[in-house]
Structure formats: structure tokens, C-alpha cells
Amino acid sequence: MRRHPQTATKHLFVSGGVASSLGKGLTASSLGQLLTARGLRVTMQKLDPYLNVDPGTMNPFQHGEVFVTEDGAETDLDVGHYERFLDRDLSGSANVTTGQVYSTVIAKERRGEYLGDTVQVIPHITDEIKRRIMAMAEPNADGRRPDVVITEIGGTVGDIESQPFLEAARQVRHDLGRENVFFLHVSLVPYLAPSGELKTKPTQHSVAALRSIGITPDALILRCDRDVPEALKNKIALMCDVDIDGIISTPAAPSIYDIPKVLHREELDAFVVRRLNLPFRDVDWTEWDDLLRRVHEPKETVRIALVGKYVELSDAYLSVIEAIRAGGFKHRAKVEISWVGSDDCQTDGGVASALGDVHGVLIPGGFGIRGIEGKISAISYARSRGLPVFGLCLGLQCIVIEAARSVGLTEANSAEFEPGTPDPVISTMADQEHIVSGQADLGGTMRLGAYPAVLESGSIVAEAYQSTKVSERHRHRYEVNNAYRERIAESGLRFSGTSPDGHLVEFVEYPPEQHPFVVGTQAHPELKSRPTRPHPLFAAFVKAAIDYKEGELLPVEMPERVSNGAERRDQVGQSIPEPANRG
């Protein structure tokens, strides 16, 4: 009798059917959080069926944000959910794309590694997918293997692009044995208002499509706008050949942080550990219950304006939004996001209308010239009113440009936006010049991943971190031009953090006596924030917004400027009146 090899690591695959955007990533993340709270070591992976090697060159409006890991991989935004819910760092191997798989297989064929075989989807493509899935079960740096690998299969069952990944997952179950692999399928149960009915047929057809390729799900997540009655659960269990204990109803939750509670109430985690014969303890809710109290019982509310280029799609700033909210949780505050298109801030009237009733301004990262003057105008407006400002990556660069213009460098700009500017206060990094000039690939070639920085003792950022040595993740090609540091410093802007060799500017800020909180970082600290462990810079920013709301700070006297930084001499020294409503 054939015996499957013993494996210490179990594999759980999450697929989706009927429609996209059903929340597979959040479902997988929440289940991972539950298993972790039961004392299991969990890691996660996303299989993306698109042909791009990674999302680094994709339009944010199509894909959403690019999540950068510690080791510098540009990955899917779901990897950010995984890190936040598991509260652990993942590597680039947590995201696999069709582009990566085909690139590897074709490279092997060119090297002759297939010994003249005809290279095909099965077995060569599926074998490479399986290799990457199985690699997640390898021991970590401490020599410990994960107890469970949760792998989310992107796309929808029936999509031609997803078929090789589903086939590879089927083969993993065949290779490791059914007792070591669990399939969880997320499906839609629509409600038809005219007839007042919940319809199960789409789920039945989705499971039938899954079974046609050899996969029988062990459990079904039923997405619906209401609880699915027991009678319908029994019907779905019968028609889809799934144990009734594996039929999980998941109506819309009050927040994404409530999803683990929803799944636990339906006993999904208990069903999984029993089916996979995993050792476990009862769920430890101590940390998560404290988070939920902070989410649902805030003591105050602040409004933060996010001035960005891609505000029509909130997923383009997913980690930023989660980090701001987590910063609010730290202070038992609810953060309301005011979405402000940077194009709308290019005029005095536009910026006043957009920012007149907020308590803080966040300038996120981005690329290209569109909307840049609006971001700079937003910084000038906030500076003149003592309004807290936090700049990320491009946000730091805009703070520097605004500061340079305030000391007479009226044409100061970035080489990215205006290559011919006489004052390129933001310049191309030396090792990026050949890439920007088109002599090398754009994809995967930025300054990516974790880099250290040294902070000035006593600075706002050092006080926030409670340390003068930090490490943050990066994604950029441009840097502050060191030739302009002294001139920019005349504005009062301090270069409060640099790379260890002092060459790269990593953090800037105005001293508190000049402005309560204007801080910029070349990094992306939002990528390291966790709901249970808010990033210190976001916590400090939200605290500054709370202080602004409560403190009735007086406006700072500054000359009013036109968009290119030139002063209006007839109004120099006049303070700009405080907005009537801080609300």
C-alpha cells in the first residue's frame, strides 16, 4: 500500500468563485490570525495569475498599492494583509506570479536543464509552481518549519489564467496526502430583492467547476450581505458534497478586524485544526480583543486629509490608510480620511476648500509630475496654519521642494518632474541614472527593501522611535540633492535622519518651535505598521492631529506664495486667518 511522506507542515489553499473581490485575502489573513492565536506557526503566500513578473510597473488604478517586503520584493497588496494579521514579516517568496514562473521555466529551457524535453504547462509550469509552494514549508533562519502554509490562489475558478495554479494545488494534495492538505473555497450567495431569496446555484456551479479539475473543497466560505440560514447551509452541504461543519456564513463585518471573530463564531478554525490533525490550544483573544475595543470604542475623532494622485481607488493607498487608522487606535481615536485629489489643491481657493476643516495632512508616495504642485501647495497651506504634515517618500521630496522655494529658489524642483530645472533639489540617485535614461529595465530596479538610518538625537523622529538607529523599507529612485542642503536649511528644515554614511537624506522635519509637526521620510513606514503595533511615526502624527484639534494653535506668519514659490510682496508678514471650523 502506498504511503504518503510524513510532513510536519500542513497546506491550506484558498480559492474563489462566482465573482472577484469577495475578500479571499482578508479571509485567508483572518484564518491565519486565528491559527496563530491557537499557538500554531503560520506563513502565507499569494499566487497571482497575471503575466507581469511583479506589480512594480503596474498602474495603481488597476492593481492598487505595491507592497514591498523586507528583502525588497514588490508584491501584491494582499501580502500586506498577511503581514498585518499575522504580525510577522514575509519575504518575496510570499508572492508568486505567472510571469515569474514562466521566466524561470524559459530560463531553464535555455540552459538545457530539461534535457531536450518538450516544455509544457504540465508538468513543467505546474512543477515550478509546486516548487515555490513547497519552498514555503522550508525551515526559517531559526531552523523552525511552519505548522501551516496558507496559499491564496488569485483570480476566480474558471479563469483560464488560474488553471495552472489550481492544477498545481491539486497535485500538492496528491503528493502530500489528503490528510495534509485543506481546500477552502470562497463563494458568493447573492440575495435577489424582487423574490426575497438567497440563491445557492452560483455556489453549486462554482464548486462543480472546481471539482471538474479534481479539487473537492473541504469548506466553503459563503459571502452574503446577511446570515445564511441553516436550511440553505444544509442544502449547499448536500449539493456540493461538503461537511455541514465546513459551511461557513460570513456576512459583512463592522470592520476588517472583526472577521477573525466571525470565522471563529462559525468554528472554521476548529474545523481546520481537527481536519488537519494539528495540535492546538484555545484561541488567545487578549491582544485582539484590546484592538477591537480601540476600533469600536474611540474616545475622539480626527480628520486627516490624504492628498494624493490616485484617490479614486483607495486600494492604491491601502497600507497608508491602515497605518493611519492604527495610529489612531494607539490614542483611542477614530481617524476619518478626507480623500483629496492633489490636482484640486493647485489654487488658493482649492487648497483652502480641501483642507480647511482637517486636523492633519498626509502626503503619500507616487510617481510623475501630475498633481505635484497641488501637493506642494497643500504643504504651504498646512505650514502657514500649524497644521500637522506627514510626508512619505514623494511626500518628503515635496516638503524639501516647498522649503527650497521658501528661501528664494523659486524654480526648485525634482529632476523627475522637471529635468531642466536650474535648481534640482531632488536628483536622480547615482546608481539609477542609467535606468532613468532608458539603458536598463524599470521593473525591480529601484532602491527597494529595508535600509538603516541614523537619526539626530532629540529630533521629533528620534523621540517617536525612542531610538537613533532605525530600519525602514524603501521604494524610490530619487534623493535629496546634497549640494542644496545648506541652502534648504535656511528655511529651518532639519535633515534629522540620514543613511549611516550620511549621504542619503532619510528624514526631514521642522523644529517644534517653528512648526508643531512637519515630518517627512524617504521610506515607506506604513509597510511595517500593524493594527496591534502601530508604527511610531503614524502614532506621533495622529497625536499631533489630536493636539491641533484641541489646542487652537495660532497661525504661523508666512508670506503667501504663488504656485511656483514666488512671494507676493504686498502681503509679506500678513498672517492667514484660521479656518472658522475645526470640527
From Swiss-Prot:
Chain residue ranges for the region called Disordered: 559-583
Binding-site residues, L-glutamine: 366, 394-397, 416, 477
Known regulation of activity: Allosterically activated by GTP, when glutamine is the substrate; GTP has no effect on the reaction when ammonia is the substrate. The allosteric effector GTP functions by stabilizing the protein conformation that binds the tetrahedral intermediate(s) formed during glutamine hydrolysis. Inhibited by the product CTP, via allosteric rather than competitive inhibition.
Binding-site positions, Mg(2+): 78, 152
Region (Amidoligase domain): 1-278
Domain Glutamine amidotransferase type-1: 303-551
Binding sites annotated in the UniProt record for CTP: 20, 159-161, 199-204, 235
Catalytic function, reaction form: UTP + L-glutamine + ATP + H2O = CTP + L-glutamate + ADP + phosphate + 2 H(+); L-glutamine + H2O = L-glutamate + NH4(+); UTP + NH4(+) + ATP = CTP + ADP + phosphate + 2 H(+)
One GO cellular component, as annotated: cytosol
Binding site for UTP: 20, 199-204, 235
Gene3D superfamilies: 3.40.50.880, P-loop containing nucleotide triphosphate hydrolases
Pathway(s) this gene product operates in, as recorded in its UniProt entry: Pyrimidine metabolism; CTP biosynthesis via de novo pathway; CTP from UDP: step 2/2
Family named by the database record: Belongs to the CTP synthase family.
Miscellaneous comment text of the record: CTPSs have evolved a hybrid strategy for distinguishing between UTP and CTP. The overlapping regions of the product feedback inhibitory and substrate sites recognize a common feature in both compounds, the triphosphate moiety. To differentiate isosteric substrate and product pyrimidine rings, an additional pocket far from the expected kinase/ligase catalytic site, specifically recognizes the cytosine and ribose portions of the product inhibitor.
HAMAP family: PyrG
Name of the protein described by the UniProt record: CTP synthase
Gene field: pyrG
